[in-house]
Regions:
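Exposed beta-strand face motif in extracellular beta-rich ectodomains
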Residues: 113-119, 203-207, 302-306
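Conserved structural position at the C-terminal beta-strand
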Residues: 121-123, 211-213, 310
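Basic K/R-rich, polyanion-interacting modules in nucleoproteins and related proteins
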Residues: 224-265, 317-385
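Substrate-binding/active-site clefts of carbohydrate-active enzymes
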Residues: 325-330, 368-543, 551-570, 580-589
């Protein structure tokens, strides 16, 4: 009896705009980090019932900054967003209809050197935007206000422009030192109102303004990015989007970025100390419109990190002019958010996220030995003979690593299975996840171990006659994805947002009813190119034997987010595009498994199951039979017909049905 499991990830997100604007006071108004303060919220500024709060249970969600308004840390007693810690509960005062919270900042935030802190008011479960606006409170009697430009801002200028800087401070006169790219360009020993104009700027500038009063020092940082103009130059043939290594010269690599509507792009990285000059402005190919740049002087075997600084001087409303992003075709990504949670025991010698940078960066390394495959001619089990064991690496064993699976290969062999299906291992947001919140489809997530460990696992499976199938979520991508971020709608200007109206890859609103994340538009040529590159990468680089395509109902452009009937009926556009993706997979590997999690109508699934079946191909379809099997386990005869676990019942010419009684998306029927 075949036991095949999978995950059906149909998550509909319902977000209700329930944010409220509260009024508040902080007493005393001026305080140091080691003084007790009281935050008071006016009860009449909150409609508790909007948040389904009926017992005056409101909570403070806090975070703190250092003296330079950087290095954000969450309050250690926040709890989780959907379950605030009781330590952060406000005290309700019925006589005055106020909510109060008293604390000492250094104790509350468990740090010193606090320059400011932020907080918001929320319901215990903040899901659905049950929160107030963000509130920022300054700490200390000495404060610096950077009037022009904004703190942490990047200003885009034409070459030769002047740039004005002004700031004020509290607490009396202070000493000001302005540095650009590490060199002091102006000082003022005693003032409370500072101003300076930097003239004739021709290169990118990273500024620091150091303000000292007594023993207190506050540093403000900001930058200028120079528009280098459009550098038109034909790109040599043979280069793909992403990194193309020069196999004849390991000191060189070519970077290619497809960024329509963008005016210019810089490459910033460890090879230029994250201070790109005009030499690192990407050229634009006149035929394709793609940006490209050849890197020289690289050391063979050394890991470099880089990202693109992508600029659109007149973006659409709510889109940022500057986006810093990793390469969409990254095969190894470093993350300021996730990497601190990956232990060295799981990923030895992991490249380090570059200090002082923001957002994900891509790792580039020329030369070096590739993985030495022991099996290069694996003969896959026949489609009709597959016995698939689904694995979520995170939950398989305590260490949550590929090594866990490698160490248990005998366990898999003894079970009698002949295929392992890995739930998504592509770079996803966070460290502990099912993996369907994918951000970088060509990068292996580091939380489970190095990419060579994944290859070792696949190689070992092949040595034991076990195929490896990869679960892929290519109907959507999440917000860290570079193709979302380069054309994002960011009304809050916080660096996060969904696709804007000019996004060439994603729909602004999902075109099917089961969407999660950002919905790919698979009728766009660029999306199709991206998907095919992903397919090629995992087949050729990782020797993956097949893909289980998640939520294939989402590959249509014909429906709306609220029209479930449309989503569930036959759609010609997704039939055609999914056949095209299957054909491409088979062009790389004629025996490749193509498996769809569609759960649709027989007439649509027949199109795929019978497609090229006379050539030994045909697409396999998941067949959920949980309910009738469950009826049988309870001894009931009603609705207990399991006839549809067979392919004939669905009109399939050959055995192309992956029938199952249970999956991890369903309750288990047996233990």
């Amino acid at each position: 009896m075949k036991k095949i499991t999978f995950i059906l990830f149909l998550l509909t997100s319902f977000a209700y705009a329930q944010q409220q604007t509260v009024t508040f006071t902080v007493a005393p108004a001026v305080f140091s980090e080691d003084e007790s303060i009281t935050v008071t919220i006016n009860g009449n500024s909150i409609n508790e019932s909007t948040w389904s709060v009926n017992d005056n249970s409101l909570y403070l969600w806090g975070w703190s900054f250092d003296s330079n308004d950087q290095n954000t840390q969450d309050c250690p007693t926040n709890g989780t967003w959907n379950s605030s810690d009781e330590a952060n509960k406000f005290t309700y005062n019925s006589g005055t209809d106020t909510y109060t919270k008293t604390f000492v900042p250094t104790s509350f935030f468990n740090r010193t050197g606090i320059g400011s802190f932020g907080f918001l008011v929320k319901a215990k479960n903040g899901d659905g935007d049950k929160k107030s606006q963000d509130i920022i409170v300054q700490v200390g009697s000495f404060q610096v206000d950077l009037t022009t430009p904004a703190d942490l801002s990047s200003t885009i200028l034409s070459s030769g422009s002047d740039f004005s800087i002004s700031a004020t401070n509290t607490g009396g006169n202070a000493s000001y030192v302005l540095k650009s790219n590490g060199t002091t360009i102006d000082t003022n020993a005693s003032t409370a109102n500072y101003s300076y104009t930097h003239t004739n700027i021709t290169e990118n500038q990273n500024y620091t303004l150091e303000v000292t009063q007594g023993e207190n020092v506050i540093t403000k940082t900001f930058s200028v990015i120079i528009n280098p103009g459009t550098i038109i130059e034909a790109m040599p043939s043979g280069y793909e989007d992403g990194i193309t290594y020069n196999l004849a010269d390991n000191t060189k690599a070519i970077l290619v970025l497809d960024a329509p509507n963008k005016d210019f792009v810089y490459v910033a990285g460890s090879f230029n100390n994250w201070q790109p000059t005009s030499a690192y402005a990407m050229k634009k190919d006149p035929d394709t419109g793609k940006f490209w740049l050849e890197l020289n002087g690289l050391a063979e075997g050394e890991s470099y990190s880089y990202q693109y600084w992508v600029v659109e001087e007149t973006p659409v409303t709510n889109s940022p002019a500057l986006v810093k992003t990793a390469d969409p075709y990254s095969t190894l990504v470093l993350s300021q958010f996730d990497d601190p949670g990956i232990p060295a025991s799981k990923y030895p010698d992991m490249p380090v996220f570059p200090s002082g940078q923001e957002r994900e960066v891509t790792v580039l390394k020329t030369g070096g030995p590739g993985y030495d495959w022991q099996v290069t001619d694996f003969e896959k089990p026949k489609k009709e003979d597959l016995i698939i064991y689904e694995v979520l690496v995170r939950d398989f064993d305590a260490e949550m690593s590929y090594q866990n699976l490698i160490d248990r290969i005998d366990y898999f062999s003894n079970l009698g299975i002949n295929a392992i299906q890995l739930m998504p291992v592509m770079e996803f947001e966070g460290n502990e996840s099912w993996g369907y919140n994918t951000a970088f489809h060509m990068a292996a997530d580091k939380f489970y171990g190095p990419s060579d460990k994944l290859k070792e696992l696949i190689d070992l499976c092949h040595q034991n006659g076990i195929a490896v199938i990869l679960d892929v979520a290519l109907n959507h991508a999440f917000d860290r994805n570079p193709m979302v971020r380069m054309w994002m709608d960011d009304p809050n200007n916080d660096g996060w947002g969904g696709p804007s109206s000019e996004n060439p890859y994603f729909n602004t609103v999902a075109r099917h009813s089961y969407n999660v994340g950002n919905d790919f538009n698979h009728q766009q040529d660029r999306t199709q190119y991206y998907v095919k590159r992903v397919i090629k990468h995992w087949i050729q680089e990782y020797h993956i034997d097949g893909f289980r395509w998640d939520l294939t109902k989402g590959f249509t452009q014909n429906c709306t987010a609220n029209d479930e009937a449309c989503t569930n009926t036959y759609q010609q556009d997704r039939v055609d595009i999914l056949k095209e993706y299957a054909d491409y997979s088979w062009s790389l590997d004629p025996s490749h498994y193509v498996i769809f999690e569609h759960l649709g109508t027989d007439i649509e699934e027949q199109e795929w199951a019978n497609y090229k079946v006379d050539e030994g191909k045909g697409i396999m379809l998941w067949g959920k039979m949980t309910d009738p099997y469950n009826q049988l386990t309870m001894g009931y005869t009603e609705n207990a017909n399991i006839n549809r676990v067979g392919h004939v019942s669905r009109g399939f010419t050959e055995k192309r049905l992956v029938g199952y009684a249970e999956s991890h998306d369903e309750e288990r029927l047996m233990f």
